[in-house]
Curated annotation (Swiss-Prot):
One of its GO terms (cellular component) is extracellular region. The keyword Secreted applies. It is found in: Secreted. Residues 27-36 form a propeptide. Expressed by the venom gland. This is Potassium channel toxin kappa-KTx 3.4. Disulfide bonds join 43-61, 47-57. Residues 1-26 form the signal peptide. It comes from the Eukaryota. Potassium channel inhibitor (Kv). The keyword Signal applies. Has the structural arrangement of two alpha-helices stabilized by disulfide bonds (CSalpha/alpha 2(S-S)).
Amino acid sequence: MKSTLMTASLLILVLLSIIDYASVYAEFIDSEISLERQWINACFNVCMKISSDKKYCKYLCGKS
């Protein structure tokens, strides 16, 4: 009984740490995507001020 309880407790701790890691990793991915979008928008805005060629700026900055 005691070993079953210890095993269950250990399993719960492992699962909680996996869930915690997954949530931190998901936040990291969201922030990476947000930074990428900000960079693309900034690149596009600067390019448009310089060249005014929308098609070229979309190609240059990777904006779809």
